[in-house]
C-alpha cells in the first residue's frame, strides 16, 4: 500500500470522527456538540485559574532559652520584622492564592503555612506551599529584640530593633534600622538603607545604598552602583568597581580601593586612603588628617578648607596640576608635574596625591 492510499484512509478516519461528533447523541448529563461548547472549553483553558482568595495565618510561637536566631525562608514577597521587649514570636502570614474558583483558591491558601524547624540555636520558619495553582506570601513578624534575624529570598525586607540582621538572596528594597549588632549579607538591583547599626559587612551590586550612624565600621564590596556613608564611626573598607562612593564625616580610618567610577571623601576624621584606577577622586579636608590619593586617567581634586593644616605633596605623571585657586604654580620636570606646599600654621597632616595621565586640582 502506497503513501497515497494511506493518506486517503487517514482522511476518511478524520471525517468520520467529525461526523460522529456532530451527530452522536450526548451522554447522560452532557450537552450535544456545538461550536459554543468548543469556544467555552477553549476560553476555560485560557483563563487558567480565575479564582482568587486571601487568607492570613496568625500565630504565636514560643521560644526556648537557647534560641539565638530566627531564620525566615521562602516568603515570596515582603518581610517586615519588628524587635520588641517580648519572649515569644508573633506573626501574621498573609497568603494570596489563585485557583479554578474562589472556594478552591481559599483551600489552597489555607494549605500555605509555616513549617517550624529547630536547628541548634536557630528557629527556622519555612513557608510550605501546595503543589496546586500559585500563591504569594507576605509576612509581618514581631520578635524578641535579643534575636538575630536572617531572611532569605524575600522581595523587600524591613527590619528594626533586632540584635543582628542577615539578608541573603533577596530582591526589592532593604531597610534596616536600629540593628544593635552586625548587618551582613548580599544584595543586588534594589536600594539598601541602613540607619543606626553596630557594623556592616555587605556585597552590593547594581543598586543605591545609604548607611548612616554605623558605630563599628563598614566593610563593603560595591559593584555598579552608588554608595553613601554618613556620620559613622569605626574603620571603613570599600572595594569598588564602577561605582560612586561618598563618605562624609567618617569618625574612623577609611580605605577605598578599586577601579572606575568616582570616590568622594568629605571631612574625614581619621587617616584615609583612596587607591583607584581610572576613577575621579575628590577629597574635602576640614581638619588635620593624613590622606593618600592614588588614581589614573581621571581628575584627582583636593579641597583644603581654612580650618585644615596640610603638608601637600602632589605629583601628576603625564598629566597636569591646576593650583591657580590657591595662587601656586607647580613645577614640571620631564613627564612629572609636582606641587609641594604647606597650608595653615604649624606642622600639618601629610596629604599625598599621585595621578597618572590625569589632572590634579588643588582648591580652597
Where are these regions (language model features)?
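Intrinsically disordered, low-complexity terminal regions
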Residues: 1-364
